[in-house]
Amino acid sequence: MRRYYAKYQGKKIVEDKALRAFVDTQLLLDQSPEGISGRLKYKREKGIQYISKESIYRYIKSIHGRRIEAALRKKKKRRTTKRTTGTLDGRTFIDKRPSSINKRMRIGDAEFDFIVSGKGGSGILLVVVDRKLRVAFLEPIYKVTIEAVHTAAKKIKQRYPEWRTGTTDNDLLFARHKELERELLIRIFFCHQYHSWEKGTVENTNGEIRVYLPKGSDISLKTPSFFRTVEKRVNSRFMECLEYRTPDEALHRCRKQKRSPRAL
Protein backbone atom coordinates (compact mmCIF):
# COMPACT_ATOMS: atom_id res chain seq x y z
CA MET A 1 0.00 0.00 0.00
CA ARG A 2 2.85 2.38 0.89
CA ARG A 3 4.51 1.68 -2.47
CA TYR A 4 1.22 2.36 -4.31
CA TYR A 5 0.69 5.61 -2.41
CA ALA A 6 4.27 6.80 -3.00
CA LYS A 7 3.80 6.41 -6.75
CA TYR A 8 1.38 9.33 -6.78
CA GLN A 9 3.24 11.66 -4.47
CA GLY A 10 4.40 14.82 -6.24
CA LYS A 11 2.02 14.13 -9.13
CA LYS A 12 1.29 17.83 -9.67
CA ILE A 13 4.99 18.48 -10.27
CA VAL A 14 5.52 15.40 -12.42
CA GLU A 15 2.64 16.27 -14.77
CA ASP A 16 3.83 19.85 -15.36
CA LYS A 17 7.07 19.75 -17.36
CA ALA A 18 7.93 23.42 -16.85
CA LEU A 19 7.29 23.23 -13.10
CA ARG A 20 9.25 19.99 -12.73
CA ALA A 21 12.21 21.39 -14.67
CA PHE A 22 12.22 24.51 -12.49
CA VAL A 23 11.96 22.56 -9.21
CA ASP A 24 14.64 20.05 -10.23
CA THR A 25 17.01 22.78 -11.38
CA GLN A 26 16.61 24.85 -8.23
CA LEU A 27 17.05 21.85 -5.92
CA LEU A 28 20.26 20.99 -7.73
CA LEU A 29 21.36 24.60 -7.14
CA ASP A 30 20.86 24.07 -3.39
CA GLN A 31 17.64 26.07 -3.12
CA SER A 32 15.31 24.89 -0.35
CA PRO A 33 11.68 23.79 -0.93
CA GLU A 34 10.62 26.80 1.17
CA GLY A 35 12.60 29.14 -1.07
CA ILE A 36 11.29 27.61 -4.29
CA SER A 37 7.68 27.71 -3.11
CA GLY A 38 8.02 31.28 -1.84
CA ARG A 39 9.60 32.37 -5.11
CA LEU A 40 6.61 31.03 -7.04
CA LYS A 41 4.10 32.45 -4.57
CA TYR A 42 5.47 35.93 -5.21
CA LYS A 43 5.28 35.23 -8.97
CA ARG A 44 8.99 35.81 -9.53
CA GLU A 45 9.02 33.22 -12.34
CA LYS A 46 6.72 33.92 -15.29
CA GLY A 47 4.66 31.06 -16.66
CA ILE A 48 5.31 28.64 -13.79
CA GLN A 49 2.45 27.75 -11.47
CA TYR A 50 2.64 27.90 -7.68
CA ILE A 51 3.43 24.76 -5.69
CA SER A 52 3.56 24.44 -1.91
CA LYS A 53 6.71 23.49 -0.02
CA GLU A 54 4.88 20.40 1.31
CA SER A 55 4.25 19.24 -2.27
CA ILE A 56 7.91 19.71 -3.12
CA TYR A 57 8.96 17.65 -0.09
CA ARG A 58 6.49 14.91 -1.11
CA TYR A 59 7.87 14.98 -4.64
CA ILE A 60 11.44 14.60 -3.35
CA LYS A 61 10.44 11.58 -1.27
CA SER A 62 8.49 9.99 -4.12
CA ILE A 63 9.89 7.59 -6.70
CA HIS A 64 9.92 10.48 -9.16
CA GLY A 65 12.19 12.66 -7.06
CA ARG A 66 14.60 10.02 -5.84
CA ARG A 67 17.43 11.06 -8.14
CA ILE A 68 17.53 14.59 -6.75
CA GLU A 69 16.86 13.78 -3.10
CA ALA A 70 20.57 14.05 -2.35
CA ALA A 71 20.52 17.62 -3.67
CA LEU A 72 18.70 18.88 -0.59
CA ARG A 73 21.18 20.46 1.74
CA LYS A 74 21.32 18.97 5.21
CA LYS A 75 21.58 21.58 7.92
CA LYS A 76 24.58 20.72 10.04
CA LYS A 77 25.50 22.03 13.44
CA ARG A 78 28.24 24.55 12.82
CA ARG A 79 31.25 24.94 15.07
CA THR A 80 32.58 28.44 15.48
CA THR A 81 36.21 28.75 14.46
CA LYS A 82 37.97 31.03 16.90
CA ARG A 83 40.74 33.31 15.77
CA THR A 84 43.20 35.18 17.92
CA THR A 85 41.63 38.16 19.64
CA GLY A 86 43.07 40.80 21.85
CA THR A 87 42.80 44.40 22.89
CA LEU A 88 42.20 46.86 20.08
CA ASP A 89 42.55 50.54 20.89
CA GLY A 90 39.86 53.08 20.11
CA ARG A 91 37.06 50.72 19.23
CA THR A 92 33.46 51.88 18.84
CA PHE A 93 31.25 49.13 20.17
CA ILE A 94 27.95 48.01 18.71
CA ASP A 95 26.07 49.72 21.56
CA LYS A 96 26.77 53.04 19.84
CA ARG A 97 25.65 51.87 16.42
CA PRO A 98 22.77 54.03 15.12
CA SER A 99 19.29 52.53 15.46
CA SER A 100 18.74 52.89 11.71
CA ILE A 101 21.45 50.26 11.18
CA ASN A 102 19.80 47.93 13.68
CA LYS A 103 16.54 48.27 11.72
CA ARG A 104 18.18 47.47 8.36
CA MET A 105 16.74 50.63 6.85
CA ARG A 106 19.28 51.28 4.11
CA ILE A 107 21.76 49.64 1.81
CA GLY A 108 25.44 49.98 2.75
CA ASP A 109 25.40 48.86 6.38
CA ALA A 110 27.41 45.65 6.40
CA GLU A 111 28.82 42.96 8.65
CA PHE A 112 32.17 41.35 7.93
CA ASP A 113 34.12 38.36 9.14
CA PHE A 114 36.75 35.79 8.19
CA ILE A 115 36.46 32.14 7.25
CA VAL A 116 39.75 30.41 8.02
CA SER A 117 41.52 27.39 6.54
CA GLY A 118 41.50 24.05 8.31
CA LYS A 119 44.40 22.65 10.29
CA GLY A 120 47.51 22.50 8.14
CA GLY A 121 46.08 24.91 5.57
CA SER A 122 46.71 28.59 5.05
CA GLY A 123 44.81 31.61 3.87
CA ILE A 124 41.56 33.20 5.00
CA LEU A 125 38.43 34.46 3.27
CA LEU A 126 37.07 37.95 3.92
CA VAL A 127 33.26 37.95 3.83
CA VAL A 128 31.28 41.21 3.72
CA VAL A 129 27.46 41.06 3.79
CA ASP A 130 24.96 43.90 3.41
CA ARG A 131 22.54 43.77 6.35
CA LYS A 132 19.53 44.96 4.34
CA LEU A 133 19.97 43.08 1.06
CA ARG A 134 21.97 40.06 2.34
CA VAL A 135 24.23 40.35 -0.69
CA ALA A 136 27.70 38.93 0.02
CA PHE A 137 31.13 39.86 -1.29
CA LEU A 138 34.06 37.44 -0.94
CA GLU A 139 37.79 38.07 -1.22
CA PRO A 140 40.43 35.39 -0.54
CA ILE A 141 43.58 36.42 1.34
CA TYR A 142 46.42 34.00 0.66
CA LYS A 143 49.15 35.67 2.73
CA VAL A 144 47.57 36.74 5.99
CA THR A 145 48.72 40.19 7.09
CA ILE A 146 46.96 43.36 8.17
CA GLU A 147 48.00 44.99 4.89
CA ALA A 148 46.50 42.11 2.90
CA VAL A 149 43.23 42.45 4.80
CA HIS A 150 43.08 46.16 3.96
CA THR A 151 43.79 45.40 0.30
CA ALA A 152 41.01 42.79 0.18
CA ALA A 153 38.58 45.20 1.84
CA LYS A 154 39.41 47.90 -0.71
CA LYS A 155 38.72 45.45 -3.55
CA ILE A 156 35.30 44.80 -2.08
CA LYS A 157 34.63 48.52 -1.69
CA GLN A 158 35.24 48.93 -5.43
CA ARG A 159 32.52 46.36 -6.14
CA TYR A 160 30.31 47.57 -3.29
CA PRO A 161 30.61 51.38 -3.35
CA GLU A 162 27.46 51.69 -1.21
CA TRP A 163 29.41 50.36 1.81
CA ARG A 164 29.04 52.91 4.64
CA THR A 165 29.43 51.00 7.92
CA GLY A 166 30.77 47.64 9.02
CA THR A 167 30.20 45.53 12.12
CA THR A 168 32.80 42.92 12.98
CA ASP A 169 34.56 41.07 15.80
CA ASN A 170 37.77 41.78 17.71
CA ASP A 171 40.27 39.96 15.50
CA LEU A 172 43.78 41.39 15.79
CA LEU A 173 43.85 41.73 12.02
CA PHE A 174 41.70 44.82 12.65
CA ALA A 175 44.36 46.41 14.86
CA ARG A 176 44.57 49.34 12.41
CA HIS A 177 40.82 49.77 12.16
CA LYS A 178 40.99 53.57 12.24
CA GLU A 179 43.24 53.49 9.21
CA LEU A 180 40.85 51.07 7.52
CA GLU A 181 37.96 53.43 8.20
CA ARG A 182 39.82 56.24 6.44
CA GLU A 183 40.77 54.05 3.49
CA LEU A 184 37.24 52.77 2.94
CA LEU A 185 35.38 55.91 4.06
CA ILE A 186 33.23 53.85 6.42
CA ARG A 187 32.59 53.58 10.17
CA ILE A 188 33.46 50.33 11.93
CA PHE A 189 31.58 48.99 14.96
CA PHE A 190 32.82 46.10 17.09
CA CYS A 191 30.86 43.28 18.69
CA HIS A 192 31.53 42.44 22.31
CA GLN A 193 34.02 39.66 22.96
CA TYR A 194 32.58 36.21 22.15
CA HIS A 195 29.20 37.68 21.11
CA SER A 196 29.15 36.33 17.55
CA TRP A 197 25.35 36.62 17.41
CA GLU A 198 25.78 40.40 17.27
CA LYS A 199 26.83 39.88 13.64
CA GLY A 200 24.35 37.15 12.87
CA THR A 201 23.87 38.09 9.22
CA VAL A 202 27.45 37.35 8.23
CA GLU A 203 27.53 34.29 10.51
CA ASN A 204 24.53 32.85 8.67
CA THR A 205 26.14 33.66 5.33
CA ASN A 206 29.32 31.88 6.43
CA GLY A 207 27.17 28.80 6.98
CA GLU A 208 25.93 29.03 3.39
CA ILE A 209 29.50 29.41 2.13
CA ARG A 210 30.51 26.30 4.08
CA VAL A 211 28.30 24.24 1.77
CA TYR A 212 30.91 24.89 -0.92
CA LEU A 213 33.93 25.32 1.37
CA PRO A 214 33.59 22.61 4.05
CA LYS A 215 35.34 22.73 7.40
CA GLY A 216 38.96 21.74 7.02
CA SER A 217 39.35 23.20 3.52
CA ASP A 218 42.65 24.84 2.58
CA ILE A 219 41.76 28.27 1.21
CA SER A 220 45.22 28.68 -0.31
CA LEU A 221 44.41 25.87 -2.75
CA LYS A 222 41.28 27.61 -4.07
CA THR A 223 41.43 30.10 -6.95
CA PRO A 224 39.80 33.55 -7.02
CA SER A 225 37.43 32.25 -9.73
CA PHE A 226 36.28 29.53 -7.34
CA PHE A 227 35.28 32.16 -4.80
CA ARG A 228 33.47 34.20 -7.48
CA THR A 229 31.44 31.10 -8.26
CA VAL A 230 30.64 30.58 -4.57
CA GLU A 231 29.71 34.26 -4.26
CA LYS A 232 27.32 33.94 -7.19
CA ARG A 233 25.70 30.84 -5.69
CA VAL A 234 25.24 32.46 -2.28
CA ASN A 235 23.76 35.58 -3.87
CA SER A 236 21.31 33.49 -5.91
CA ARG A 237 19.34 32.17 -2.92
CA PHE A 238 15.60 32.88 -2.82
CA MET A 239 15.10 34.75 0.46
CA GLU A 240 11.86 35.28 2.36
CA CYS A 241 13.14 38.56 3.85
CA LEU A 242 13.56 39.87 0.28
CA GLU A 243 10.08 38.68 -0.78
CA TYR A 244 11.81 35.72 -2.43
CA ARG A 245 14.05 37.80 -4.60
CA THR A 246 17.70 36.85 -4.60
CA PRO A 247 20.29 39.18 -3.01
CA ASP A 248 21.68 39.88 -6.50
CA GLU A 249 18.22 40.83 -7.76
CA ALA A 250 17.62 43.06 -4.75
CA LEU A 251 20.95 44.85 -5.24
CA HIS A 252 20.30 45.33 -8.96
CA ARG A 253 16.84 46.71 -8.17
CA CYS A 254 18.22 49.21 -5.66
CA ARG A 255 20.96 50.38 -8.00
CA LYS A 256 18.48 50.73 -10.84
CA GLN A 257 16.37 53.07 -8.75
CA LYS A 258 19.34 55.47 -8.61
CA ARG A 259 18.37 56.68 -5.18
CA SER A 260 18.83 55.54 -1.59
CA PRO A 261 16.18 52.81 -1.23
CA ARG A 262 14.12 52.76 1.94
CA ALA A 263 12.13 49.70 1.02
CA LEU A 264 12.36 46.86 -1.42
Which residues are covered by each model-predicted region?
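Mobile genetic element proteins and their domesticated derivatives, centered on retroelements
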Residues: V23, I36, I56, D113, ...
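Two-metal-ion RNase H-like nuclease active-site motif
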Residues: I107-S117
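Active-site beta-loop-alpha junctions of metal-dependent nucleic acid enzymes
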Residues: G118-G121, L138-Y160
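RNase H-like two-metal-ion nuclease catalytic core shared by retroviral integrases
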Residues: T168-N170, A175-H177, F190-L213, S220-K232
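C-terminal domain-tail junction helix/linker
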Residues: K215-L264
